[in-house]
């Protein structure tokens, strides 16, 4: 308990899944949390933290958050979008949205809060990427892989540029994780049971991960326990990428 006592943390994509689990764990560990999401109804069910409905695709709104929120110690960029299809079937809209949310929104959030971290003498940035794109290629996930690979590059670039300012930047790369988003994608296949079985089959541990397991890694990277870690892309994938 109290591993984040005295720290202010901001989490995007906070209404459900990994983001929500991260908010709840951070609160239990003593952090003051600001939770952001575009889903107002789900966000409103979070208790014990400050919530704000924000469209991260609106650059003007994101740029203004620094003044509104103030200095933070921890930034978790968890908001994301999963687009399906290979290169030839991917539509321009899905490709652009993948970059707008998976890369550009994270970049703007970092750009907004980084000066405050530098002035304070340090901070921790945690980007939620994926093994898809950042570590391996995954079929029918072209835009997702390309954008999450770019997020890995963003992570390392920020880490190397600001390490001497005491700012750490790392990325979590999950495998398949149970979440409302996963359920929606499974349902969209037309045979959710078969799709789930296929996802489980590619995990050597024989199961899908939980949002709470990913949140536990986010907690470690947000805390001072990981003070010697920066620029790392950490797989948490049930052994998917170990071969």
Named regions from a protein language model:
Residues 110, 147, 155:
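Active-site helix of classical SDR
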């Amino acid at each position: 308990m109290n591993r984040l006592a005295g720290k202010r943390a901001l989490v995007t994509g906070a209404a459900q899944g990994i983001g929500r689990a991260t908010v709840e764990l951070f609160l239990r560990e003593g952090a003051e949390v600001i939770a952001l999401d575009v889903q107002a109804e789900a966000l409103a069910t979070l208790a014990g933290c400050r919530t704000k409905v924000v469209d991260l695709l609106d650059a003007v709104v994101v740029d203004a958050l620094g003044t509104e929120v103030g200095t933070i110690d921890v930034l978790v960029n968890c908001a994301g979008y999963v687009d399906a299809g290979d290169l030839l079937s991917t539509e321009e809209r899905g490709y652009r949205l993948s970059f707008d949310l998976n890369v550009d929104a994270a970049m703007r959030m970092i750009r907004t809060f980084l000066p405050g971290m530098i002035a304070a003498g340090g901070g921790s940035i945690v980007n939620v990427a994926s093994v898809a794109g950042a570590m391996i290629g995954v079929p029918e996930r072209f835009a997702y892989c390309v954008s999450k690979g770019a997020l890995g590059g963003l992570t390392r670039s920020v880490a190397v540029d600001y390490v001497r300012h005491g700012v750490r930047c790392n990325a979590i790369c999950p495998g398949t994780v149970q979440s409302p988003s996963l359920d929606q994608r499974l349902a969209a296949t037309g045979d959710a049971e078969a799709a789930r079985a296929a996802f489980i089959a590619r995990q050597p541990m024989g199961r899908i991960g939980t949002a709470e397991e990913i949140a536990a890694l986010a907690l470690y990277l947000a805390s001072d326990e990981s003070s010697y870690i920066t620029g790392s892309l950490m797989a948490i994938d049930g052994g998917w990428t170990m071969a």
